Amino acid sequence: MSEFTNVTIIREANVYFDGGVVSRTVVFPDGTKKTLGIMQPGEYTFTTGAPEIMEILSGELDLKLPGSDAWNRVGGGESFDVPANSSFTMKVLSLTDYCCSFLG
């Protein structure tokens, strides 16, 4: 889906890692939320409360998911699932545009 209709955008930015990751929250009529953001090159570890689906719209990163010691390359047009109450690490290799869907 390349656009969202009938949504509310929270104007205040979500800023992480001194501006290395910045996003805006989109709230849908049913109350579900997504964030649309940009990641600068760097290494970032995030923790989750709810399960998430991360869609990489453009860019490239190496990903380490919970319970794994392996790094996997993820690029534009790909996505990955993150379980609830966990953490994951990304080594962002180039400017990366993403959409994160919160499932819980």
Swiss-Prot record:
Q: Which Gene3D superfamilies does the entry link to?
A: Jelly Rolls
UniProt key word Transferase: yes
Instruction: Say which family it is in.
Output: Belongs to the nucleoside phosphorylase PpnP family.
User: What is the name of the protein in this document?
Assistant: Pyrimidine/purine nucleoside phosphorylase
Keywords on record: Glycosyltransferase, Transferase
Annotated HAMAP family: Nucleos_phosphorylase_PpnP
Q: Does the keyword Methyltransferase apply?
A: no
Q: Which organism is it from?
A: Geobacter sulfurreducens (strain ATCC 51573 / DSM 12127 / PCA)
List the GO molecular function terms: guanosine phosphorylase activity; purine-nucleoside phosphorylase activity; pyrimidine-nucleoside phosphorylase activity; thymidine phosphorylase activity; uridine phosphorylase activity
Q: Which CDD domains match?
A: cupin_PpnP-like
The record lists the catalysed reaction(s) as: a purine D-ribonucleoside + phosphate = a purine nucleobase + alpha-D-ribose 1-phosphate; adenosine + phosphate = alpha-D-ribose 1-phosphate + adenine; cytidine + phosphate = cytosine + alpha-D-ribose 1-phosphate; guanosine + phosphate = alpha-D-ribose 1-phosphate + guanine
What this chain does, per the entry, is described as: Catalyzes the phosphorolysis of diverse nucleosides, yielding D-ribose 1-phosphate and the respective free bases. Can use uridine, adenosine, guanosine, cytidine, thymidine, inosine and xanthosine as substrates. Also catalyzes the reverse reactions.
Pfam families the UniProt entry points to: Ppnp
Q: Which InterPro entries match?
A: Ppnp, RmlC-like_jellyroll, RmlC_Cupin_sf
What EC number(s) is this enzyme filed under? 2.4.2.1, 2.4.2.2
What cellular component GO annotations does this protein have? cytosol
Taxonomic lineage: Bacteria, Pseudomonadati, Thermodesulfobacteriota, Desulfuromonadia, Geobacterales
